[in-house]
């Protein structure tokens, strides 16, 4: 019976995460597409890829959740940087599971106005009454279900960007949510 309850807990956690993520897809940013188009006209050389321009144009049009999947070297960090550049006047927090991952994110994104934290620091130390415009979570395949639930329960972000590679090292604790969220 104990094992069944343990597995049932994993199932319940996964369902809660997926339901929270689905709820974030119900509404996008008003006039988002027009804002991005204007920004791209004003900054024609910022994004060097038509594919990334197209992604940025649609990213938050109908959803407050964006999910970026890709193997190493596919441009995930570059896309995070472009999103950050578009939201340059907004408040941004970048989180990852480990200190080296956070430092790597800081080095690649180069957003001096953003905050960079480990997931644990965000969960346990970030002020619950402080809402950020956009929360980035990098290396999502390494984020446990339990930690993801805690991040989602804080509900202190307007937009959420989840980034990762499902073939990367998995979470040490149980963490299947990022792979399942693709579907």
Model-derived regions, located:
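Conserved ATP-binding/catalytic motifs of P-loop helicase motor domains
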Residues: 1-183
């Amino acid at each position: 019976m104990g094992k069944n309850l343990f597995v049932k807990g994993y199932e319940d956690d996964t369902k809660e995460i997926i339901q929270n993520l689905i709820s974030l897809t119900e509404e996008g940013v008003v006039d988002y597409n027009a804002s991005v188009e204007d920004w791209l006209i004003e900054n024609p050389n910022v994004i060097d890829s038509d594919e990334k321009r197209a992604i940025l144009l649609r990213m938050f049009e109908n959803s407050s959740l964006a999910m970026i999947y890709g193997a190493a070297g596919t441009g995930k960090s570059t896309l995070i940087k472009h999103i950050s550049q578009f939201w340059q006047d907004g408040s941004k927090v970048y989180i990852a599971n480990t200190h080296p991952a956070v430092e790597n994110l800081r080095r690649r994104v180069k957003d001096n106005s953003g905050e960079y934290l480990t997931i644990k620091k965000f969960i346990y130390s970030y002020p619950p009454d402080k809402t950020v415009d956009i929360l980035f979570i990098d290396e999502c395949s390494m984020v446990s279900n339990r930690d993801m639930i805690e991040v989602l329960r804080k509900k202190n972000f307007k937009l959420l960007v989840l980034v990762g590679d499902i073939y990367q090292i998995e979470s040490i604790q149980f963490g299947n949510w990022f792979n399942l969220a693709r579907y």
